[in-house]
């Protein structure tokens, strides 16, 4: 028995040493240590308290604590780089250790990564990864071939970061001798989205399946994700921060967190938010979004449907009143256009991957119409 255990321990030690040697054969890069900003999706890259935050450090004094804490989550952030590597590894830590997933959302979405690339035909391709969740989370993307016709050539990659966890540190590795070139931030104007848990990414199976990430790829332009789970409430400190961003369009998708607000209070919030944005950025379009659920969604919870319909009705009325007052450059995305049905959510609120794609397609269609 003792001999048997000794053999097992020796084999284990050899395996551990072999894995360590493989890791040593990789060249590792720390995005936070880059000579220039490389974390896309941040509106204030030089003002953040921690490298993977979404709001500037000064916002801690102006937004509610719940909003600030959620802003530490890396939802919507991604890193662009070029490489000819046939294997890419990522190792990183998150602040909520041991709490990697949620009952209605897998660890791969809450705390995981997602790697996409653009082939030489301009099409998006995706790399499945092997992952392990512990104090140090690891992802291994093997046998990468972005384009068979250009084997061994550099590919352009986008690594999407966790939706519902805060990244404390990260390193990206490629085999020694392979090329790896971080890409600078885009200088294009971003789409800026202020929303709820749905915008933050709940409950996508992986970060790249959040509707905001799908939208970013479909529009092929930068996107700032200001989605805060349970806390997308059209609050002035967030509206003021949004006006600091020279956006191509502002999106206000907060009704799911405002269904309990009395009609008059909801009217005021919508009205003041639109006026606040247009006072500072009069030429930037503002897209108002109805509640994603309604009578056509097939949900058989009468109270929930009634609340959703009521909030959307208030939004439609405010939209009409704003138009009557001569406010221009405002648009409305309807519940019907979002097209949610009985297959679209995990729990009657948060989208499945199918629901995320439905959201992204509806947004893509209307934003293209507005901007072109």
Indicate where each model-derived feature is located.
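N-terminal secretory targeting modules
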Residues: 13-190, 368-372
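Histidine-centered active-site loop/cap adjacent to the catalytic His
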Residues: 346-372
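Serine-esterase "nucleophile elbow" of acetyl-processing enzymes
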Residues: 104-107, 147-151, 157-232, 236-246
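Structural recognition of the beta-strand scaffold that forms the well-ordered cores
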Residues: 190-193, 222-226, 249-253, 285-289, ...
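Substrate-gating cap/lid alpha-helix
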Residues: 294-333
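Sec-dependent N-terminal signal peptides
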Residues: 4-13
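Oxyanion-hole/transition-state-stabilizing segment in secreted/luminal serine hydrolases
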Residues: 203, 215, 232-280, 291-298
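The substrate-binding groove and active-site-proximal loops of carbohydrate-active enzymes
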Residues: 255-266, 301-309, 347-354
């Amino acid at each position: 028995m003792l001999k048997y255990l000794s053999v097992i321990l020796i084999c284990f030690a050899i395996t551990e040493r072999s894995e360590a040697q493989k890791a040593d054969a990789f060249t590792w890069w720390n995005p936070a240590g880059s000579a220039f900003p490389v974390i896309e999706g941040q509106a204030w890259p030089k003002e953040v308290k921690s490298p993977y935050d979404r709001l500037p450090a000064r916002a801690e004094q102006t937004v509610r604590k719940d909003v600030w804490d959620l802003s530490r989550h890396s939802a919507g952030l991604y890193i662009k780089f070029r490489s000819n590597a046939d294997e890419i590894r990522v190792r990183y830590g998150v602040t909520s250790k041991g709490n990697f997933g949620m009952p209605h959302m897998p660890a791969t979405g809450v705390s995981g990564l997602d790697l996409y690339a653009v082939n030489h035909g301009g099409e998006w391709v995706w790399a499945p990864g092997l992952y392990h969740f512990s104090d140090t989370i690891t992802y291994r993307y093997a046998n990468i071939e972005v384009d068979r016709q250009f084997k061994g050539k550099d590919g352009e990659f986008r690594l999407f970061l966790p939706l519902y966890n805060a990244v404390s540190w990260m390193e990206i590795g490629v085999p020694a001798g392979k090329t790896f070139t971080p890409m600078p931030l885009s200088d294009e104007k971003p789409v800026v989205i202020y929303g709820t848990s749905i915008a933050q990414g709940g409950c996508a199976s992986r970060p790249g399946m959040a509707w905001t990430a799908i939208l970013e790829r479909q529009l092929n332009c930068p996107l700032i994700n200001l989605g805060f789970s349970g806390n997308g409430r059209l609050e002035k400190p967030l509206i003021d921060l949004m006006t600091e961003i020279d956006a191509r369009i502002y999106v206000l998708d907060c009704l799911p967190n405002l269904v309990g607000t009395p009609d008059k209070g909801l009217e005021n919030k919508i009205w003041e938010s639109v006026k606040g944005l247009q006072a500072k950025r009069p030429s930037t379009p503002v897209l108002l979004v109805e509640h994603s659920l309604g009578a056509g969604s097939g949900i058989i919870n009468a109270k929930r449907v009634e609340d959703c319909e009521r909030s959307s009705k208030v939004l439609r009325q405010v939209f009409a009143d704003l138009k009557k007052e001569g406010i221009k450059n405002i648009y409305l995305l309807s519940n019907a256009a979002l097209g949610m049905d009985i297959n679209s959510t995990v729990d009657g609120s948060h989208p499945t991957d199918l629901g995320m794609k439905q959201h992204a397609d509806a947004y893509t269609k209307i934003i293209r119409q507005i901007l072109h």
